[in-house]
Design a protein with these regions (language model features):
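Hydrophobic N-terminal alpha-helices or hydrophobic patches in metabolic proteins across all domains
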Residues: 1-140
């Protein structure tokens, strides 16, 4: 999918929260470690898994319930129980090298936790972080 220039994101998980929520506000699961990023759903965009497109916010920390609009800088290629579940990376400014590394490291650890949850829920299929793609910069 071609990434858009900007995305309007409804925040469902505040940065440092342990609770992963569904778009309707119900609890999906409690993580063994906190989210390093605010996380939510993109308004008006459906993902391949049938849910609203996921997005994480890098560079600031909007709280659960807020709606924020930021440029899209890239995406995390993620597979959850055999289904593509990519996450757009948004924020007020282009992520630094350290932030890019944090995003990839976090989602590799997150994949490990999700694999265990999938096993517990009786789901099969691969769960993995397949890497991070940076949106090409536009020379101005």
């Amino acid at each position: 999918m071609l990434l858009p220039h900007k995305a309007l994101v409804q925040i469902e998980v505040s940065r440092y929260s342990f609770v992963k929520r569904r778009p309707n506000g119900s609890v999906d699961f409690v993580s063994p470690f906190p989210s390093l990023f605010s996380y939510g759903s993109v308004h008006g965009v459906m993902a391949d898994d049938g849910d609203p497109q996921d997005a994480l916010v890098v560079g600031c920390a909007p709280r659960r319930g807020e709606a924020v609009e930021y440029p899209v800088w890239g995406q995390v290629f993620f597979v959850d129980a055999g289904v593509a579940d990519h996450k757009w990376i948004v924020g007020p400014r282009q992520p630094s090298e350290v932030q890019w590394a944090m995003v990839e490291g976090f989602f590799r650890l997150y994949a490990w936790a999700k694999r265990w949850m999938s096993l517990w829920r009786g789901l099969s299929g691969e769960t993995a972080c397949k890497g991070v793609e940076r949106k090409p910069s536009v020379a101005g």
